Amino acid sequence: ILSTFAKQASVKEVLVIGGGVDKPIGEFDCSMQILKTGILQANGITKIGVAGHPEGSPDIADNEIKRALQEKNEFAIKENLNMYIETQFCFEAEMVLAWEKKAREDGNQLPIRIGIPGPATIKTLFRFAQISGIGPSMRFIAKQAGNVAKLMTVQSPHLLLAGLAEGMAADKACLIKHFHYYPFGGFVRTAKYARAISDGNVSLKTNGGFEIIEN
């Protein structure tokens, strides 16, 4: 299957993730086992994303996450792979920046793409946070979900993006290089939001963050 996709669709980049079940299905129980087979490299895959957990994982212990990230760093260097970290979605910049710095201190050298929840109602964000089982962000969004009047209010990630931008600018060694959006509020809405930011159609707010300028 991989060989067919790689040839017919010219696939050169994949995201390899594992976990999420109590009992592994099949012969692999973690992403490193797949990486070590060499099947990706053999089929011309030149760019590989692996999971990042700024808030930890409900399925994997923190010390195991740390060990796995160190192993992936070593493997990327050994195999000369173009590898990067793709993270779960988050809501608070301070937490993400602290995680990145700690991972760097622990030896991480892989560039990082941070998961950003696209514009969506608080009700929708709360539902996805529940499904993902993430911790601090769950508590963050739960506080807002507790206000019934705000449940259908569309939440923008402007404070998260602004906070990350400030942190990245202040720490030149920061390994956060890209963002990727989770289109919880719909693909079109998320795409329009991302395009507006890319085009610079934003206005800074006096109380922090920014807002999109509607054309």
Label every PLM stretch briefly.
Residues 9, 30-50, 98-113, 192-210:
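Alpha-helix-loop-beta-strand connector modules within alpha/beta enzyme cores
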Residues 72, 81, 114, 164, ...:
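Conserved, mostly hydrophobic/aromatic
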